[in-house]
Amino acid sequence: MKIKRLITIGICLLLTTGCWDQNLMKNAILIQTITFDRTDEDKFLFGIAIPDIYSNALTSGQETQASNSQTLSTIANTPREGRMKLNTEIPGNLDASKNKLILFGEQFAKGDIYPSLDVIWRDPRSSMSAKLAVVKGPAVDILRVKPKLESSISQNILNLIQSTETNTIIPDETIQSLASEILDPGEDIVLPLLKIGHNGTAIDVEGLALFNDRKLAGTLSREESTLFLLLNNKRGKYARFTKNINDNKPKMINFVSLNVDNMRRKLDVSVNNDGDVSVNLNLRLDLAVEEFPIGNVPKKLNQLNEELSKIFTSEAGEVIHKLQEANCDAFGIGRRLIAFHHGSWLKKDKVSYFRNVKFESKVEVEIVRYGIVK
């Protein structure tokens, strides 16, 4: 019986066809970054960064391999056509399976970014973990920056994005998580905003790019971005602020540096009989004092809590005002209307409903730690 079974298995193995649908890495040129730009002539500029591996000779006579970045770009009608054109310029096949970044130029992002991403979602070999960002100026220019600490510009930008995610400056967003958000009629997206530093050898995170209906419509600064993410209940490992608590006087002793130890966010959406939408947004922050040059925190504890609560509440109002000015429903108020007030949502103007939402926001601060010992 065992022999018959072995013979049967052997025959099946012999008749089983092998899979020849393979992609050999030795023939692949890995794309590390993709950029989308609009030229002054209103044409589509497609750019990529690929690794450029070279050898370094050591004094001992041995060689080590290192990698740099090579930038390629072309004018095309679509991203797929652009990739086909660039494929004719290099020996090998372009492969986006290890792509790290997708960058939009500022002018390009002012148009609808969705069509440019269509090919990425359709290609089964595309990397769904790629990060996205908007670049002030042409995105392809940022690929030509020569960073001092990292030879690969793609890895440099990726490290920067990951560190600012940890510090609650930008949200953790990938091409996969963006897919559902960008098609949601009740929510708008926000993406990191990058710029080339003044010396041309560094890249800075400027803040957040606000989108309205898949088009760039406004921005938030770095500090505003952190507060927005807390208001949106998205906190990274750290969330730090430095606030002036003495009539905006510039001296060092008038500032306090804080880190969010814990937080609680409550957002309630209500609709009255006239169909007007109101939102109560309350944020409670438990803060740790990391720097206070005046020194005596316990003595000024109540005063600091009260002053900081006023400052954060005022700044929260400014952040919400900027979101409404850009018509960017990043809080997903429309999504809550669809789910819990569907009849009211059907009557709303889907283009401008967010601008007409009445917000009541309050931030309550309590300092819970101000030294090494809690």
Label for each model-derived stretch:
Residues 2-374:
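Membrane-proximal alpha-helical signals and transmembrane carboxylates
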